[in-house]
């Protein structure tokens, strides 16, 4: 007698993955949702937290912006990943993340809202980061 095993993989929601990248991309939550706890890139998203704490302890006289810069860079990477995930076509998304789920993705307006919010906040954070960094590097922080 032969038995066949049916592997059931949970369906991964593209809008939810993008929302996680938008809200918690700093901590790599979207990576853990998609790939599980063994994802190395997800754990790399957590590395800036102890790095920022170490900078705060080792360089207490440094400007606060330098101390949180690793966190900002991780957040910007999370925003970028949220955009990449959300803009992936549904058929490619299903082939990569939902091959064994037995369901097809059908994204709608919630994903569009997440993508617009991600682009707005991500662009704003990037511009503010560049402005503050250039201010600190070229004027020593004279403008703030």
What residues fall within each predicted segment?
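Alpha-helical transmembrane segments of integral membrane proteins, especially early/N-terminal helices
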Residues: 31-45
């Amino acid at each position: 007698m032969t038995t066949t095993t049916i592997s059931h993989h949970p369906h991964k929601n593209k809008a939810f993955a993008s929302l996680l990248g938008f809200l918690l991309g700093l901590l790599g939550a979207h990576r853990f949702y998609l790939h599980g706890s063994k994802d190395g890139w997800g754990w790399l998203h957590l590395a800036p937290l102890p790095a920022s704490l170490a900078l705060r302890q080792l360089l207490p006289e440094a400007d606060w912006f330098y101390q949180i810069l690793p966190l900002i860079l991780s957040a910007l990477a999370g925003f970028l990943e949220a955009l990449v995930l959300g803009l992936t076509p549904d058929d490619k998304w299903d082939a990569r993340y939902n091959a064994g789920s037995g369901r097809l993705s059908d994204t709608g307006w919630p994903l569009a809202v997440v993508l617009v919010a991600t682009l707005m906040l991500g662009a704003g954070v990037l511009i503010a980061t560049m402005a503050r960094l250039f201010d600190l590097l070229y004027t020593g922080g004279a403008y703030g």
